UniProtKB/Swiss-Prot annotation:
One of its GO terms (cellular component) is small ribosomal subunit. The keyword Nucleotide-binding does not apply. PROSITE patterns: RIBOSOMAL_S12 (PS00055). This is Small ribosomal subunit protein uS12. The lineage of its organism: Bacteria, Pseudomonadati, Pseudomonadota, Betaproteobacteria, Burkholderiales. Residues 105-125 are annotated as: Disordered. PANTHER family: 30S RIBOSOMAL PROTEIN S12 FAMILY MEMBER (PTHR11652). Residues 113-125 have a biased composition (Basic residues). The keyword Cytoplasm does not apply. The modification 3-methylthioaspartic acid is found at D89. With S4 and S5 plays an important role in translational accuracy. GO terms for biological process: translation. One of its GO terms (molecular function) is tRNA binding.
Length: 125
């Protein structure tokens, strides 16, 4: 416990909270252009080919973001919407690409959790 004199001389230091998605600059989403679309492998103990894209954002940041869902239509120069949110088993991937927005189509034939994958409501028979 500091004395009053110590507090007068030094004061309390405020803890600085570090952002988990610095490239967003406090925005909910950011637009960007894909510079590279590729697959990568997750860290142990998982095994797969995860689809990721390197995206140059409108604020100049270059980030690696994850493409969720089964199948996608992304290529180089595709314009995408990026949101925060990391992928636990892919080191360095701290962003997600929003499905069904701008150049990225929603997941085809998706019946459940449709809003997360940009899928339209199926036609009722």
């Amino acid at each position: 416990m500091p004395t009053i004199n110590q507090l007068v001389r030094q004061g309390r230091t405020v803890e600085v909270v570090k952002s988990k998605s610095p490239a967003m600059e406090n925005c909910p989403q950011r637009r960007g252009v894909c510079t590279r679309v590729y697959t990568t492998t997750p860290k142990k103990p998982n095994s797969a080919l995860r689809k990721v894209a390197k995206v140059r954002l409108t604020n100049g940041f270059e980030v690696i973001s994850y493409i969720g869902g089964e199948g996608h239509n992304l290529q180089e120069h595709s314009v995408v919407l990026v949101r925060g949110g990391r992928v636990k088993d892919l080191p360095g991937v701290r962003y997600h690409i929003v499905r069904g927005s701008l150049d990225l189509q929603g997941v085809k034939d998706r019946k459940q959790s449709r809003s997360k994958y940009g899928a339209k409501k199926p036609k009722a028979k």
